[in-house]
UniProtKB/Swiss-Prot annotation:
This is Uridine kinase. Keywords: ATP-binding, Cytoplasm, Kinase, Nucleotide-binding, Transferase. Its EC number is 2.7.1.48. One of its GO terms (molecular function) is uridine kinase activity. It comes from Psychromonas ingrahamii (strain DSM 17664 / CCUG 51855 / 37). The gene is udk.
Length: 212
């Protein structure tokens, strides 16, 4: 098999399923093995569409768990550019302002790019850019508890607003779009980020694709 110059890994699953934990763990371990300048990580959240033209109260009403909330075409374009050894400017999203900031983060081409997000496997064009995909399969009740703690502590949300959003959009969109997308995953991972075997399997596959 010909080795790849750039391997793209997608880690998908429900909100607060443990995607970030496993993504960060793999990122840190690969940085130690391959070098920090060879590994990049991109959050799908960075590609929420710009809503600066809307008033803040209207931005709060957006369904952020629907595929249309993301500018996946820009993410696809950036992945193609990174594979062609070009640099890209990744948007910076504000969870408190519910839109992109005026800043961006520059990423250069990497040997391994780790994507993390809820709807990475729902978009067929995006799937074509992905070399290995995993779906974190965590029970929804656990996801909800984690989401409550996270959003109240880190995103200045109230318990009522988190529960209302979960009932109106998060759970319905998971059942309609996110859960069905796991059929496209190469690996389905139970127990979230604590699944050591899944992490080791993924790292082995990455090294194989890199020809290591």
């Amino acid at each position: 098999m010909d080795s790849k110059n750039c391997v793209v890994i997608a880690i998908a699953g429900a909100s607060a399923s443990g995607k970030s934990l496993i993504a960060n763990t793999i990122y840190q371990e690969l940085c130690e093995e391959l070098g920090t300048n060879q590994i990049g990580m991109i959050s799908e959240d960075s590609y929420y569409r710009d809503q600066s033209h809307l008033e803040l109260e209207l931005r709060k009403l957006t369904n952020y768990d629907h595929p249309k909330a993301f500018e996946h075409e820009l993410l696809c374009s950036h992945l193609k550019m990174l594979k062609e050894n070009c640099s890209v400017n990744i948007p910076v999203y504000s969870y408190t302002e519910h839109t992109r900031t005026l800043e961006s983060e520059t990423m250069t081409s990497k040997k391994v790019i780790i994507l993390e997000g809820i709807l990475l496997l729902n978009d067929s064009a995006l799937r074509e850019q992905i070399d290995v995909s995993i779906f974190i399969d965590t029970p929804l009740d656990i996801c909800l508890m984690r989401r409550l703690v996270r959003d109240m502590a880190e995103r200045e949300r109230t318990m009522d607003s988190v529960l209302l959003q979960y009932t109106k959009t998060v759970r319905p969109m998971f059942l309609q779009f996110i859960e069905p997308s796991k059929q496209h995953a190469d690996i389905i991972v139970p127990r979230g980020g604590k699944n050591r075997i899944a992490k080791d399997l993924l790292k082995t596959r990455i090294k194989y694709l890199l020809g290591k």
